[in-house]
């Protein structure tokens, strides 16, 4: 009987040592732990190739705005309503006009067009053009759009092919 209690006591001591470690892991999120280098945070600003470097804080703010305003349909960089068109770098670059820079993404969020750029889809896709139709866009300003664009462009550098890769990564 004494050996059972001795064994139980050793097990409990082991758990007591492990609990602070587990709490520390639970409290520290990857976003808090991430300190990305300038190369990771640097993305194309416009079609001419000019670059802009975002701060960690700006990317975190962009992530929050994106998740609140766009995350329902674009979680993880996918497009739930059209799995052929995601937010991965290749798809953004092949759009017409290309949407692989901050300026183009902001322009798209203001007045979205079809993937081939032939017609407006503002009546179907949330945008600033009709914030009454899409209330999630109502309170966003140009700075919010810029931060979301930064987040969209930095995400594949951090998450790799999982960003825009679809359900196989979830």
UniProtKB/Swiss-Prot annotation:
Binds 1 heme c group covalently per subunit. Residues 1-33 form the signal peptide. It is found in: Cellular thylakoid membrane. It is a peripheral membrane protein. It comes from the Bacteria. One of its GO terms (cellular component) is photosystem II. The keyword Transport applies. GO terms for biological process: photosynthesis, light reaction; respiratory electron transport chain. The keyword Ribonucleoprotein does not apply. Its cofactor is heme c. It holds the Pfam family Cytochrom_C550. SUPFAM superfamilies: Cytochrome c. Keywords: Electron transport, Heme, Iron, Membrane, Metal-binding, Photosynthesis, Photosystem II, Signal, Thylakoid, Transport. One of the extrinsic, lumenal subunits of photosystem II (PSII). PSII is a light-driven water plastoquinone oxidoreductase, using light energy to abstract electrons from H(2)O, generating a proton gradient subsequently used for ATP formation. The extrinsic proteins stabilize the structure of photosystem II oxygen-evolving complex (OEC), the ion environment of oxygen evolution and protect the OEC against heat-induced inactivation. Low-potential cytochrome c that plays a role in the OEC of PSII. NCBIfam families: PS_II_C550. HAMAP family: PSII_Cyt550. Belongs to the cytochrome c family. PsbV subfamily. PSII is composed of 1 copy each of membrane proteins PsbA, PsbB, PsbC, PsbD, PsbE, PsbF, PsbH, PsbI, PsbJ, PsbK, PsbL, PsbM, PsbT, PsbX, PsbY, PsbZ, Psb30/Ycf12, peripheral proteins PsbO, CyanoQ (PsbQ), PsbU, PsbV and a large number of cofactors. It forms dimeric complexes. This is Photosystem II extrinsic protein V.
């Amino acid at each position: 009987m004494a050996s059972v209690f001795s064994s139980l006591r050793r097990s409990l001591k082991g758990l007591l040592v492990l609990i602070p470690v587990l709490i520390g892991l639970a409290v520290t999120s990857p976003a808090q732990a991430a300190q990305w280098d300038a190369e990771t945070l640097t993305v194309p600003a416009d079609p001419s190739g000019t670059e802009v470097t975002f701060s960690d804080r700006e990317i975190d703010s962009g992530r929050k705005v994106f998740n609140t305003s766009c995350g329902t349909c674009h979680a993880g960089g996918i497009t739930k309503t059209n799995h052929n068109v995601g937010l991965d770098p290749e798809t953004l670059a092949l759009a017409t006009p290309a949407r692989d820079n901050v300026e183009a993404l902001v322009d798209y969020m203001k007045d979205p067009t079809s993937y081939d750029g032939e017609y407006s889809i503002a009546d179907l896709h949330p945008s600033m053009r009709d914030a009454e139709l899409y209330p999630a866009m109502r309170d966003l300003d140009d700075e919010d759009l810029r931060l979301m664009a930064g987040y969209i462009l930095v995400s594949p550098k951090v998450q790799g092919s999982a960003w825009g890769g679809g359900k196989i990564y979830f």
